[in-house]
Amino acid sequence: KMILMPELAEIGLSDIQYNATNGFVTARLPRNSEKEFPTIGFIAHMDTADFEAANVNPLIWEHYAGNDLILDAEAQVMLSPKDFPALKNYIGQTLITTDGKTLLGADDKAGIAEIITALEAIKAADDIEHGDIKVAFGPDEEIGRGADLFDVAGFGCDFAYTMDGGPLGELEYESFNAAQAIVTIRGKNVHPGTAKDTMV
């Protein structure tokens, strides 16, 4: 919140709020037209996966040529199109990777950056009429609880989209719902070869 809220104010958003109950930062780009437009929301998460994420050292690869990317020569860490064929889709583009020692955290810093950049572009383009556009940046997506406390009614959008990675131009319009379960089975720890009628 300490970084996002001032940045949202700097680009001219209003109603910037931090909800201490659910950890979400929300804001609104006010409508610039008297026409009737739906209120659209864009959502991204602030948390990253629970792995090494301190002291991130991004590597920038300009004009990627389709070759192996050596992230850490000493530890023999690399990204290769042999293992990651999708790299070939980005030949000629600039790639940003980790140095192989930590997470990059692009999931979902990239989504936040996309939303803020899009809002800047929309705000700067006087010829794009729009209704209210709302944003929400929240925690706990990586542990599957990000939406548990999200105030959908309070967000007040007709439609909302989550920005969370994927190839340029791809739109996912449905997804699965995942949950975690802990199953405890009480019984005898017996080798499967002799377990018939005795294990449970």
Predicted segments, located by residue:
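Acidic-enriched catalytic cores of C-N bond-cleaving enzymes acting on peptides and small amides
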Residues: Y173, A195-V200
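Conserved active-site and cofactor/substrate-binding residues in soluble primary-metabolism enzymes
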Residues: I3, A20, F37, A110-A113, ...
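Short beta-strand segments
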Residues: G41-H45, A136-G138, Y161-D164, T184-R186
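Acidic/His- and Gly-rich active-site-bordering loop/insert found
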Residues: K1-T94
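Broad gene-expression machinery/nucleic-acid interaction feature
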Residues: F24, T39-G41, D132, D158-A160, ...
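Short glycine-enriched loops at secondary-structure junctions
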Residues: M46-T48, D83-F84, G166-L168, F176-A179
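Acidic/histidine-rich catalytic neighborhood of metal-dependent amide-processing enzymes
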Residues: K88-F176
